[in-house]
């Protein structure tokens, strides 16, 4: 059973590096929600499966998002999304 999600940083609205409230590796699952207009796209990644450099790449309906996690920060490259939220789940 999965616990309650914890938002790991303020909403991401532009390219850049954001500070996480705590290390993403403290969570088994990383839940990423991407918003554009009235559409919501969500993806769940296992922390251990984010891959080399801890990258998450999401492409949905012409919207692209690349997140690179490192300790207590995340670097975002957003193309088309208006807002992104990142949650940790155990």
Where are these regions (language model features)?
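A signal for long, low-complexity, Ser/Thr/Asn-enriched, surface-exposed stalk/shaft
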Residues: 1-4
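Surface-exposed ligand/attachment interfaces on beta-rich extracellular proteins
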Residues: 7-27, 36-42
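Nucleic-acid endonuclease domains
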Residues: 17-19, 61-66, 80
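Short, surface-exposed terminal/edge motifs of secreted or surface/virion proteins that either
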Residues: 38-52
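Contiguous ligand/interfacial binding patches
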Residues: 49-66
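Noncatalytic modules at the cell exterior or secretory-pathway interfaces
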Residues: 68-77
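Short, structured beta-strand segments at or near domain termini in extracellular proteins/domains
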Residues: 79-90
């Amino acid at each position: 059973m999965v616990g309650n999600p914890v938002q790991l940083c303020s909403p991401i609205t532009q390219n850049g590096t954001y500070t996480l409230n705590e290390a993403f590796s403290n969570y088994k699952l990383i839940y990423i929600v991407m918003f554009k207009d009235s559409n919501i796209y969500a993806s769940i990644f296992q922390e251990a499966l984010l891959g080399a450099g801890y990258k998450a790449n999401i492409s949905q309906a012409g919207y692209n998002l690349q997140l690179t996690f490192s300790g207590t920060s995340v670097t975002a490259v957003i193309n088309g999304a208006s807002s992104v939220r990142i949650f940790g789940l155990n």
